[in-house]
């Protein structure tokens, strides 16, 4: 007769959870940030609001974004004029698009990750799907399982309405799943499209306009597992993961799903709330490792917007190159909510390899991944990079 303890021991993995592959995807429709204000005010029939347009132009100019990808094309917006008003009942039409397109974009990212992983998809044991775009039953996790042709016994977790911190959350959950289930291979997918948040401008709600200047569409997928086989190629190890609520930050970032879609509300002091609380998170994460020099680790921070990055950089005395990968993704894609940090992970390992650096983390051993979002919630993940083997010359 076996004991519970013996069963439990056999269930656990030996080593730490490891990122084994990363894939990303965006819609085909690309919008240029410099010309976006003209397009946005034209398509929303708001060209007469000249002062507001000038404000929006300044927001876009200061956003540090070059381009974004959006499922919503001019054609779709003309077919759905209610999306272009500030507060028109439009949830049904938004849902009809999101429920189909969110898993579809997620599938593209997942296929890319599975291809890099190089293992049969039948080895995927768990699926974690995260989106702030469109709620349904059965959810996007179910749709993705069907689209990819995964086994019916795959164990699914669906995360709706988490927001911008959730790229950290999915890694935290994948770590626990991989380390507590021997042989588990967890497919995590963050898929975000702005169809639920797009709306026309309002003079009285400039925080809504901030979102229109920043948000973009994208999906990222990561495969996580412990004890990699010789055929698998580890990219990063997940060492620890924490979540905390910043004190006195209630209402800093809110989102409400209404008949008019998903409305976002931001307080002006979000950058200072993040920058004032980030060092405590760093200390708690890295003190056990004996690390206190924040320039000695590689950085993957959710790029909520340029002001957050600037204040974090300033508060911690970070060298400008520390946030290079983060700023690159913000510039090339905008704020894709939960998917952003996974895009940054992808950018970092690729740039590290291309530059001939020794590790996947810009040549450094230890790194940190931050998610910031509604709550104000901060996710902190400690990463350990992997040595890059020199390719054949």
Swiss-Prot record:
Q: Supply the EC number(s).
A: 2.3.1.74
SS bonds (residue pairs): none
- What SUPFAM superfamilies is this protein classified in? Thiolase-like
The residue stretches assigned to a coiled coil in this entry are none
Q: In which pathway does it act?
A: Secondary metabolite biosynthesis; flavonoid biosynthesis
UniProt keywords (A-Z) are: Acyltransferase, Flavonoid biosynthesis, Transferase
Q: Where is the active site?
A: 164
Please give one Pfam family short name: Chal_sti_synt_N
Task: Keyword check for Signal, yes or no.
Answer: no
Which reactions is this enzyme annotated as catalysing? (E)-4-coumaroyl-CoA + 3 malonyl-CoA + 3 H(+) = 2',4,4',6'-tetrahydroxychalcone + 3 CO2 + 4 CoA
Q: Which GO terms describe its biological process?
A: flavonoid biosynthetic process; polyketide biosynthetic process
Kindly indicate whether the keyword Cytoplasm belongs to this entry: no
- Give the highest taxon in the source lineage: Eukaryota
| Sample GO molecular function, one term | naringenin-chalcone synthase activity
> Matching InterPro entries, A to Z?
Chalcone/stilbene_synt_C, Chalcone/stilbene_synt_N, Chalcone/stilbene_synthase_AS, Polyketide_synthase_type-III, Thiolase-like
Q: Which family does it belong to?
A: Belongs to the thiolase-like superfamily. Chalcone/stilbene synthases family.
Q: What does this protein do?
A: The primary product of this enzyme is 4,2',4',6'-tetrahydroxychalcone (also termed naringenin-chalcone or chalcone) which can under specific conditions spontaneously isomerize into naringenin.
Q: What name does this protein carry? A: Chalcone synthase DII
Q: Which organism is it from?
A: Ipomoea batatas (Sweet potato)
UniProt lineage:
Eukaryota, Viridiplantae, Streptophyta, Embryophyta, Tracheophyta
């Amino acid at each position: 007769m076996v004991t519970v303890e013996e069963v439990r021991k056999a269930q656990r993995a030996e080593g730490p959870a490891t990122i084994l592959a990363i894939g990303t995807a965006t819609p085909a429709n690309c919008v240029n940030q410099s010309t976006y204000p003209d397009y946005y005010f034209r398509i929303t029939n708001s060209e007469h609001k000249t002062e507001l347009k000038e404000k929006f132009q300044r927001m876009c100019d200061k956003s540090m974004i070059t381009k974004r990808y959006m499922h919503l094309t001019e054609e779709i917006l003309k077919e759905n004029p209610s999306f272009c008003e500030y507060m028109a009942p439009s949830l049904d039409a938004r849902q009809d698009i999101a429920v189909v397109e969110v898993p579809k974009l997620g599938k593209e990212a997942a296929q890319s990750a599975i291809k890099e992983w190089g293992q049969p998809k039948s080895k995927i044991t768990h699926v974690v799907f995260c989106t702030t775009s469109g709620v349904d039953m059965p959810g996007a996790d179910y749709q993705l399982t069907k689209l990819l042709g995964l086994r019916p016994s795959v164990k699914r977790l669906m995360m709706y309405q988490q927001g911008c911190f959730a790229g950290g959350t999915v890694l935290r959950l994948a770590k626990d799943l991989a380390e507590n289930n021997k042989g588990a291979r967890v497919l995590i997918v963050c898929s975000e499209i702005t169809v639920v948040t797009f709306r026309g401008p309002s003079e009285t709600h400039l925080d809504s306009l901030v979102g229109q200047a920043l948000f973009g569409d994208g999906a990222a997928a990561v495969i996580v597992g412990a004890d990699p086989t010789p055929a698998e190629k580890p990219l990063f190890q997940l060492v620890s993961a924490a979540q905390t609520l910043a004190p006195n930050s209630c209402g800093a970032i809110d989102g409400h799903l209404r008949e008019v879609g998903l409305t976002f509300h931001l307080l002006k002091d979000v950058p200072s709330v993040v920058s004032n609380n980030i060092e405590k998170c760093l200390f708690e994460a890295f003190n056990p490792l004996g690390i206190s020099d924040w320039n000695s680790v590689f950085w993957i921070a959710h790029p909520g917007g340029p002001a957050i990055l600037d204040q974090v950089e300033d508060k911690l005395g970070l060298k400008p190159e520390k946030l290079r990968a983060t700023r690159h993704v913000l510039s090339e894609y905008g704020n894709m909510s939960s998917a952003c940090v996974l895009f940054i992970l992808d950018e970092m390992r690729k740039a590290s390899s291309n530059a001939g650096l020794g590790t996947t983390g810009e040549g450094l051993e230890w790194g940190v991944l931050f998610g910031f979002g509604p709550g104000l919630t901060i996710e902190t993940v400690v990463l350990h990079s992997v040595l890059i083997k020199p390719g054949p010359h």
